[in-house]
Amino acid sequence: MKSSTNMGNWSQKNIYSMTIKVINEEFSICKLKDYAQIDIREPFVFTGSTDEEKSLVCPTRLVPSELLERSDGWKAFRIEGVLDFSLIGILAKISVILAENGIGIFVVSTFNTDYILTQTDRFEEALRLLSNAGYGVQYANSR
């Protein structure tokens, strides 16, 4: 999550007027033994390696056959544009709106932006709640 102690020129209104873009994929979150079967050239493949585990978030169609655990049934959207590291509260605002309505999230951050995943059965509700809060919702072209 990008954070800082200074919001710069951004106001509360700017945070709520941001656009989120729906990613037209079903996602899975996996725990792996290794990354041997992962093709990182594919879009929307996120890996994380710690001293305790190796994780993968990717389109369900790309889940490797050899894995330790998996959670299917996720949909994702991203915050459109490149987020400056000095901006704070962007992810917090989204997570509060969804948490107040009982919608859990899984977040992946990249250098440019944040990707927010929710369970598929709550995804449209999440988009509606964010739209009602002033976020623009942009749908991606179909694959």
Report residues per predicted region.
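Regulatory modules associated with amino-acid/nitrogen control
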Residues: 1-99, 125-143
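A generic structural motif
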Residues: 53-58, 113-119
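A cross-kingdom feature marking solvent-exposed beta-strand/loop segments within repeated
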Residues: 101-116, 122, 140-143
